[in-house]
């Protein structure tokens, strides 16, 4: 369905089993007088994959940074399970049950793959720096548990064989999986993915799509992506941005047939699946 303004936000209140796990309400962001987002609203629901798409310059990256709490909007609010968020530091995301991956990956080149993933799992540790420094038995036990958790995630993503390797020695698609493993090791209830398919082959994107769908039994996913075939296949709902505004929101089938979306991507070319850049066919519900 088309939207010339942001979707109406649900009434404030305690999050329910079916209420949003993350909401952006009437968010506006400007940089030096340039409006990056204007009155944007969206909601990520439990066990849902929400896709965010739009042409280049539509405001997707800004929206992602707002959702992460790294950009504070000029107006509007970000609500995480009924808790209004302000500006966050990276280490605070895990405490809110959130994890993210970035286009730049952000891996530690001088740490092994396993140790990179342990960094993500570290939010579960209860022994502080002093306890670790003194090598208390409890600290040693927690270290073993964190490494076991990290190895389990590497196994889940099919990259356990790389545990002792270092990121610079790995192919780019494997490094992408390491970054995802680090995020999953935090055991989030909301996973934020920024362009996870960039640099992947068609077969690797298919594997990524299957993985993202498999995650929804234990978390929600917000996916910012420009590969339309992946978005249409894995997302339950899609929010479309253009020039910093929400122009459409709905199921993949609804978005694919929306005239405003077709115009934003293709100009006046509508309804021709063979046209360059045409939106791919999809099944209902992103399944």
Q: Where are each of the predicted segments found?
A:
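Glycine-rich phosphate-binding loops of nucleotide-dependent enzymes
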Residues: 2-5, 13-287
């Amino acid at each position: 369905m088309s939207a010339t303004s942001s979707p109406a936000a649900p009434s404030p209140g305690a999050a329910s089993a079916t209420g949003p796990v993350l909401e952006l309400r009437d968010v506006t962001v400007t940089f030096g007088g340039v409006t990056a987002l204007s009155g944007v609203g969206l909601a990520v629901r439990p066990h849902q994959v929400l896709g965010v798409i739009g042409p280049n310059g539509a405001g997707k990256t800004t929206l992602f940074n707002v959702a992460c709490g790294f950009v504070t909007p000029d107006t509007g609010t970000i609500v995480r399970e009924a808790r209004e968020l302000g500006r966050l530091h990276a280490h605070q995301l895990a405490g809110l049950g959130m994890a993210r991956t970035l286009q730049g990956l952000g891996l530690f080149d001088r740490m092994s793959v396993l140790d990179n993933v342990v960094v993500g799992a570290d939010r579960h540790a209860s022994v502080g720096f002093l306890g670790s420094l003194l090598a208390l038995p409890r600290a040693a036990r927690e270290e073993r548990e964190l490494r076991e958790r990290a190895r389990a995630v590497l196994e889940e993503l099919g990259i356990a064989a790389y545990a002792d390797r270092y990121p610079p020695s790995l192919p780019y698609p494997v490094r992408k999986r390491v970054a995802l493993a680090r995020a999953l090791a935090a055991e989030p209830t909301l996973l934020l993915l920024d362009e996870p398919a960039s640099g992947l082959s068609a077969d690797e994107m298919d594997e990524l799509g299957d993985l993202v769908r498999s995650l929804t039994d234990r978390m929600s996913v917000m996916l910012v992506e420009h590969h339309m075939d992946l978005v249409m296949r894995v997302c339950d709902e899609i929010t479309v941005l253009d020039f910093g505004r929400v122009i459409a929101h709905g199921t993949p089938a609804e978005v694919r047939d929306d005239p405003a979306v077709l115009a934003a991507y293709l100009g006046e070319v509508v309804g021709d699946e063979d046209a360059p850049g045409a939106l791919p066919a999809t099944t209902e519900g992103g399944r």
